[in-house]
Each structure stands twice: as structure tokens, then as C-alpha cells.
Amino acid sequence: MTSQARIPLWIVAVVAGLGVITVVGLFFYGSYVGLGSSL
């Protein structure tokens, strides 16, 4: 690993984590709203 990495690994990890949290959050929010409207 060179010290002049074009993209730091922690930035990749943070972006990936935020993406997963966003997708999971939208999924649960959508299912919650769907169940609420169907009742």
C-alpha cells in the first residue's frame, strides 16, 4: 500500500456504511408506511 492512495480506505468504508444504512432505512421505512396505509 502506497502512502499516496488516491482514495483512503476509511472514506470508502464510511461511504459504503452510509449507503447500506440508507438502503436498509428506506426499506424499513417503506415497509412501515406500506403496513400503516394497508391497515
UniProtKB/Swiss-Prot annotation:
The chain crosses the membrane at residues 7-27. It is a single-pass membrane protein. It is found in: Cellular thylakoid membrane. Pfam families: PsbJ. GO terms for biological process: photosynthesis. GO terms for cellular component: photosystem II reaction center; plasma membrane-derived thylakoid membrane. PSII is composed of 1 copy each of membrane proteins PsbA, PsbB, PsbC, PsbD, PsbE, PsbF, PsbH, PsbI, PsbJ, PsbK, PsbL, PsbM, PsbT, PsbX, PsbY, PsbZ, Psb30/Ycf12, peripheral proteins PsbO, CyanoQ (PsbQ), PsbU, PsbV and a large number of cofactors. It forms dimeric complexes. This is Photosystem II reaction center protein J. It comes from Synechococcus sp. (strain JA-2-3B'a(2-13)) (Cyanobacteria bacterium Yellowstone B-Prime).
